[in-house]
């Protein structure tokens, strides 16, 4: 029994050790693959720089939509071995170098996101909280990030409907990162 605890006991994507809670290596690898896929898509110019930054930040912070929390870090917010978060921050920086991109200043960090989620979620402006976006901010995200131009920016119902549909597609991508962890 003690040998198992020293080596870690896997459960629901976590690894439980004697004094720490970590993440199963397969869960980390899946997130790293997902992040690297964003870099590949950007390198092939399949996605715009704006979509790339938005999706990368969503992968890092997760988001709140319709009062529900989505994303890898929200799921793994009970971890106590923070070394994985420092590694993931390093990994993102490494990918910028490897793919020959300059790192924009507005790229989020895993370690800060974790602390915002665990200690400041109700007041955080760092975590993407779609529920707090104004009508104007939603319209700007649709037009500036997603390049959607053919909608009435003055119609709150249209903007809200398009924004929710767009965000739910992004949420599906986030949820894929935490599926099949057993």
Residue ranges and their predicted role:
Residues 10-182:
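Active-site and adjacent loop segments of nucleotide-processing enzymes
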Residues 1-8, 113:
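Short proline/glycine- and acidic-rich turn/helix-capping motifs at secondary-structure junctions
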């Amino acid at each position: 029994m003690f040998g198992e605890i020293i080596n870690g006991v896997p459960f629901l994507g976590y690894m439980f050790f004697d004094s720490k809670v970590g993440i199963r290596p397969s869960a980390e690898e899946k997130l790293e693959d997902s992040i690297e896929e964003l870099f590949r898509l950007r390198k092939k110019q399949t996605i715009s720089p704006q979509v790339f930054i938005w999706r990368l930040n969503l992968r890092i912070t997760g988001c709140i939509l319709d009062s529900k929390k989505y994303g890898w870090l929200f799921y793994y917010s009970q971890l106590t071995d923070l070394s994985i978060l420092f590694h993931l921050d390093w990994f993102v920086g490494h990918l910028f170098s490897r793919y020959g991109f300059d790192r924009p200043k507005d790229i989020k960090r895993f370690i800060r996101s974790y602390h915002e989620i665990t200690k400041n979620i109700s007041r955080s402006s760092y975590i993407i909280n779609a529920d707090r976006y104004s009508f104007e901010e939603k319209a700007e995200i649709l037009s500036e990030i997603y390049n959607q131009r053919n909608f009435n920016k003055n119609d709150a119902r249209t903007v809200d409907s398009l924004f929710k549909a767009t965000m739910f597609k992004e949420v599906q991508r986030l949820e894929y990162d935490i599926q099949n962890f057993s």
